[in-house]
Amino acid sequence: MISLMRKCVLLVGVALLALAQSVPAQTGVTAVLPNGRAIHPAGNWIALAPYPFALAVRPDGAEIAAPSIGFPFALNVIANPADPQPSVRRMPAGENSDPAIEVHAGLAYSADGSLLYVATGDSGKIRTYKTSDWTKAAEVSLDGPIPNFSKPAEGSFAATVLASPDGKTLFALDQGNWRIVVLDAAKLERIAEISTGSYPFGLALSPDGARLYVTNTGLFEYTTIPGASEKNPLGTGLHFPPFGYPSKAAREGATVEDKKIPGLGDENSDRGSSLWTYDVRDREHPSATAKLRLGDKIVDASGGTVGGAAPTGVVASDDAVYVSLAHEDQVVRISADGKQVLTSADLSLFSGPRFQDPQGRPLRGVMPSGLALHAGRVYVAESGIDAVGVLDAASMQVVEHIPVGWNPSAVAFSPDGQTLYVVNTKGKGAGPNGGKQHDPNAPSYVGSLEMGSLSAIPLADLPSAAELAQTVLASNTAAIASRPALPHLKHCFLVIRENRTYDEVLGDVTGANGDPSLARFGLDGWAEEQKSATHLKVTPNLHALVAQFAMSDNFYVDSDVSADGHRWVMGINPTPFFNTAWTSGYGGRRKDSAGAAQPGRRALFGGADAPMPEDEPQFGSLWEHIAASGKGLLNYGEGLELEGNAELEGSQPEGQRLFLNSPLPKPVFESTDRRYPTFNLGIPDQFRFTEFERDFRIKLAAGKIPALIVIRLPNDHTADPRPGDGYPYRASYVADNDLALGKIVDFLSKTSIWKDSAFFVTEDDAQGGVDHIDAHRSILLIASPWVKPGTVSHDHTSMGSITRTIDELLGLGPMNLEDALAGEIGGIFDATPHLGPFRLQPSDTRVFNPAAARFAKPKTKKEAAALRDVDDAEEIQKEVEKSASTLRRPSSNN
């Protein structure tokens, strides 16, 4: 069972900024994470607001500032951070964002420490605060004219900021317009700009301030499809993505639906996955001096490299520059002029055949991020294994790995070099967000519960490198246990649904660890919109499937929301860039549009479920893993909701129209039923079942059923009630979903392939409900003739466990560290099959009558928006954080 976390301190606020409060720094913090791994962080633990991605140390070492993105957007200021009793300000103090506090993933102190420069993100400004009293001193917009430069920029997104060593110049990264704006620090005026490559992320200056470096973590610039207009989406948008990636069509363009779709260009050009170097000695006339492509070459061949290296962190010494490659688990040492890679360091601790993929390559998943230099060593945040790697800066040999918190993102040092500071984006997890032990007045939304942290680690107190490595290894392998061999099957089905916790659907299952008082979508459920709508059988089919087959009551999603969830469930660990994008987007501070003039506002803002080329791990996701095996796959609706789309009335059967030349992963492009809808809550899941059955029968008759079949059933996401369309309650969407699920298993269990199949059902995330164990606990059903009937697994499992089990059932090797280090879904499989079919359970027509269900016909813009938003974070947060009397079983049900 996941460990329950102690609540972090929330401070009382006054005026613009909160009062400081002394809080004991914790030591000996331990936790079990949703992915089943453990953390045993070194040093002192200081709680911060959720999702901190950066930090800055004041030059005198007396203070640290760290911005948090999302829930709320906050500025954390820690005074005396190396002391056992640091003083912490969190601004704002509560769980709600304050419009006056704008932050993103970068800030910097002035040379004398009297000012803090803060990049504000979506508003495109650099704002300064006086550190003496934390009042605003001044601000400057990155928008507007710059003398002797091109037309004034608009739509800037201020991502991070650096101060020159002499304190006279600021360099602000504009992710909207893909440029760096040079500012006079004293006057806070724009004086120059320089272009960057695709999706710039990290900035660093050489120690003498003569050179500036930027990492470009993207690959392409996505452009609007010619003739496409968001004013006439049905008539001008594409019905289906234009091409697969990588491919000749993606590079050069193609004619699709009578439209000439522009290509994306060379996936191996230096505009992306690169380090660009600039001469900034003349700050009014900076110039690019080197553009260096990093990482392995992307190839258009099954089983090869498909993802960019995702250059992320960057730091410079006098004679070299160091860059972390998030997708390749490396730090590279580059000549100071930025023109050549000198050497590289492989970071993974995991070696041997057990940690190799089917082609003998090392499993990726260390996910190196932020960097720091100190005393001839490079320190790198290893976001994927909850550690800080330490390298010898000259030889690039790994010296040690230091255990820290969940998802470390940035590292820095005290000026005296004695203390290492690390911000842990997800801290130690969320803990429960419902049930009798949860304070109904406390936050319930996962984004508000998942407090970040600062690890303050005195280097002199660290144990030996061997002991540190053993702690990191043991923590990351905590979920692995010896299990009996699984049967070898021919077909695995993966059904991906939306947003539900375990308790709100299956909390009423006897013999399992559930809270029936939270089971609003169970067999004795209720509709919150109407007090008399009680004793509803919302999910009779899921409950019947659980009784006949197997489930877990100790399964957790790795994700927080749908944006990262649809990546995690396909074996993609989101990059640091993506995590900063979705958190700012879900927090309501990242405006985007397919028709935006700014390339950085058209795509990669974390608002869609489909992986873009920039998301692709080096060797791909589960899609490429299966395709490389030659066993084949089929896709019904998953991974199609690309950036630059609109889900709207009249777009069926596909459910959307597309406005950007965004590609699909090639295996998805080649294996998708193009009549099956993607996410669109105006389309009943009954229609999805009908289309699945139609297409699948054809393939079944032809004997063309592949190894992996992925099915998206999204309507348990819920939306506003539509009584006229057959959805009188939010619970009606869940009941629609349940009936479609039952129909699919009823159909498949009577086919000839059932005896060779396993059927997995899970959610993309658990953000839409509450749970008495953990906000990440969710649903995992396994239906197969080969499971022990009625089994409830209590083993700790996660999304990687599903991938791992599919790998083993199909006779494949592991894909990456996410599945290799995940707990196996063991103890549920049997040596002999149980071949009885599943019998469909009828819906409770009080909550959902399939005969009345129809495509949505929204009458207002608000109704239309409710059907197309894959996640409206504000709406979900309000729903989840309703009073206990609403989310718990009504008194009439007790």
Please place each PLM-identified region on the residue numbering.
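Blade/loop signatures of beta-propeller domains
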Residues: 23-41, 464-475
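Surface-exposed loop and turn segments in beta-propeller and other repeat-based domains
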Residues: 44, 89-99, 138-153, 283-307, ...
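Residue-level detector of Asp-centered blade-edge/turn motifs that repeat once per structural unit
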Residues: 59-60, 111-112, 165-166, 207-209, ...
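Short, conserved, GDST-rich strand-edge loop motifs in beta-rich repeat architectures
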Residues: 67, 215-272, 425-449
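Short loop/turn segments immediately following the C-termini of beta-strands
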Residues: 69-70, 121, 175, 217-219, ...
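N-terminal pro-sequences and low-complexity stem/linker regions of secreted or lumenal proteins
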Residues: 465-894
